[in-house]
A protein has these predicted regions:
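Helical scaffold of the NTase/Pol beta-like nucleotidyltransferase catalytic core
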Residues: 1-106
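Catalytic metal-binding acidic patch
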Residues: 109, 113-134
Length: 149
């Protein structure tokens, strides 16, 4: 492996592989490590480069490391579980947004990239107005006691 692009592609795929997450070509472009895409023709360069790299395989719109084809199925299963969890997180956030001290509610963790396992919980990032963290926590805790979980 000699070019910077090849190293960047491999780095992105290795990192994603840690999470059993094959990447689409668009995601590879998004997650390239230490490489800036400077032209619209990078996808063509990528396809040529990927064909030359013996340790990268392609199937069903996904790129993955050799011997890891099974992670395509894993990703699809986790995407389905994530859809349900996002629906639940959306319902929760619609309620929590009425707490006047809440500035932002965001989804974090594996769910943020649609890679949530069936047994994973929903991780939310809550940003509050300055100086009102504990007030917000108190209000949210009380909401949780009354069935909002």
């Amino acid at each position: 492996m000699s070019t910077r692009l090849e190293k960047a592609i491999l780095s992105a795929l290795i990192y994603a592989d840690i999470f059993d997450y094959p990447l689409t070509i668009k995601e590879i472009g998004k997650y390239l490590i230490q490489f800036k895409i400077q032209s619209a023709s990078w996808r063509t360069k990528f396809k040529i480069t990927a064909k030359d790299l013996e340790f990268i395989k392609y199937k069903n719109s996904f790129y993955y490391l050799i011997g890891r084809e099974n992670i395509i199925k894993t990703r699809r299963e986790r995407e389905q579980w994530s859809v349900e969890k996002i629906k639940k997180a959306d319902k929760i956030s619609h309620i929590l947004k009425f707490i006047p001290t809440v500035r932002l509610i965001g989804i974090t963790g594996a769910l943020a990239v649609n890679n949530s396992k069936e047994e994973d919980d929903i991780d939310l990032l809550i940003i509050t107005k300055r100086g009102l963290l504990w007030t917000t926590r108190f209000l949210m805790s009380n909401l949780a006691k009354f069935g909002i979980k």
